[in-house]
Amino acid sequence: MSYYVLSKIFLYSGYLVIGFLSFTIFNKNLRNKIRDKLKNLYFLYYLTFFTLFIISSNLSYYFTEKQLLEDFNIFEKEFFEIHKINEQFFQKYLLNFPVPIRMELMSKFDPLYTVFNASFEKYAKNIGKSSYEIQTNYKNYIRTTNSEIKEKLEQIKENITPIYNKYKLPILNGENTEISIDENGNIIPVIKNTNGQITELLFYDQNYNLIPFKKFESYKVRFDLIPENKNINFKELINVYYLDEKNIITPIEYYKNNIDMSPYYIDLQENKDDFLKAIKIKKEYGLYIEKKKQLQNLTENDKLDDFKEFLLKNNNIFSLNTIFSNGNPIFTYAINVKAKSIINYLITKEFNINLTNQNSQTALHSAIIQKYDLNFIKSLIEKGANPNIRDGDNKLPIDYSDKTSEIYKYLIGI
């Protein structure tokens, strides 16, 4: 008899116990007969059924897990096929987000628990099974408490980690850039020629665009290859620096300090065949996220003085282009929560007014959706807001305005 059959026998036995116990509870005559017969031991009747139910449930669960363990090789094949499909959907989903939000999402990411329904549906269609059946079986394995199964899951999880970890690396035009690293494991995006030589370093500007890193302040950015170290698995290390007025080498720590867009590092000492398995999160990143929440709260409550003081104290990690964890840039979020004082302050400052949120909407989209008046819309246009940017639904800002409104007439005339 299979473990599956045994688990079902004990499962339905438990149902029968509960059914009979419920019948007793709701049948007054039967309750009275049992009470008269058992007298002071009446409680044992219910205790016996409760005990039988617990035993049946535990045995059902035990044999279910035994069956899962026996079928693990079959599940393992399904697991890899599902995640091959899932990575395609994951890429499409993740690349819609600005870099800081993508990095933050990856910091919370666990591949075992992040499988799209569409992945189950596509896999089920490929093999001619029910999507519900595939999904239920997958969840049964993920939720198991069996230590042997959990150990096996961790082993196969390690094999799929690289296909997801690559999204922690810099991405340009939908593809990972080439990378090098410094002696501390900080990830440095680079461009290489056809001979595999580094020709250019890249960095994220304040608008979250990946661009050539040629100037640091007023100095020319330079780099040297660090001689090979047998104790380091990642072979290509570089030293990034500039020469000051006295021709003294000064290290550039952009890649170390830019926690917003570069929160990960490669563990150079960890003995891994594939460096993608050795990507880790910088310890400062958790504090950065907490501070970003503080800034968001100040914006939401329109506390301008505290807002300005906070940015002044943390200007090395935050700017007016910072994007909050909810996917909104500071200015867009201020518009959404109608933080009037902060809006009036920000509009006098220099920042990228066309940064998009998690829905690919700009501040202009949000202002029209939130029904701000014509004067405010005009001030955004004068500030440089682009009325021709489409959001995730392929809509222009004007598409959210009433066609009889002054705002519509103004935007249509631009």
From Swiss-Prot:
Task: Supply the Pfam families for this chain.
Answer: Ank_2
Disulfide bonds listed in the record = none
Indicate yes or no for the key word Hydrolase.
no
Domain of life, per UniProt, equals Bacteria
ANK repeat start and end residues: 326-355, 359-389
Q: Which UniProt keywords apply?
A: ANK repeat, Plasmid, Repeat
**What InterPro entries is this protein classified in?**
Ankyrin_rpt, Ankyrin_rpt-contain_sf
Can you say what this protein is called? Putative ankyrin repeat protein BB_B28
